[in-house]
Amino acid sequence: AGKTILLHAEQGFGDTIQFCRYVPRVAEQAGHVILEVQQPLRGLMSTLSGAAQIVSRGEPLPAFDLHCPLLSLPLAFGTRLETIPSQTPYLSAPSEKTSAWRDRLGNRERPRVGLVWAGDPRKSLPGANRIDRQRSLQFDQLAPVLRVRDCEFYSLQKGDDALEQLHRSALDHRVIDWSADFHDFSDTAALIENLDLVIAVDTAVAHLAGALGKPLWLINRHNTCWRWLLDRDDSPWYPTARLFRQDATREWDSVVARVQAALRDYARDWKIGSAPAASC
């Protein structure tokens, strides 16, 4: 107590979103927490409890007594599956941005579903690129999902290659793409706050939806990342997540078919008022 501790992000955006949940616990013990994050996350992190100061990576750092990488905090707290701090939401969008999206969207007539079908290819990093090719879909592979007529679909996708897939597709009319207005993660979060459901591959936006407490359907690769565990369709990290796993590497058809069937049920339940709706 009485010390100033620097908590600094490492690895990707999704890792920062997942493990910033420990910041309030650190603040209870250390007193003053400085949180250093990637610049596109700074606005979003302003909604996180426990951080007295937030700085962008590369900026001069204030004085501190101790430091710890975010991804070392589960070890520092002796985390086990049953002790994961799983309460959500622990992040939110700035209220003025959420209100602006609400006004833009207008009246809700059908469930609003956000989509992310690809990650960052990171072509200069062979290992990361290989994993991205395993976790990502081509946009047209989502065609069965887009045929669920009683839903509105919104792109939460970033990246020129993935968006080109959308805009050259015969199904592009089924998806509203306002991604040019996503300047940082707080903008994406504000749109998600106005949606009912997010369907995403294993990307930072999946973590964002989970951290916001939004229903998340994760389309997950067969050789899964460690954090999603094995042989379960839920997540101890995100209570609102439902996992749809591949049966074999790069075999997406059966996964997408299961998502399509689940979405048909969801849209039917939403229509009669029994599906969870967005809070906004």
Regions found by a protein language model. Give the residues of each.
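Catalytic machinery of carbohydrate-active enzymes
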Residues: A1-C280
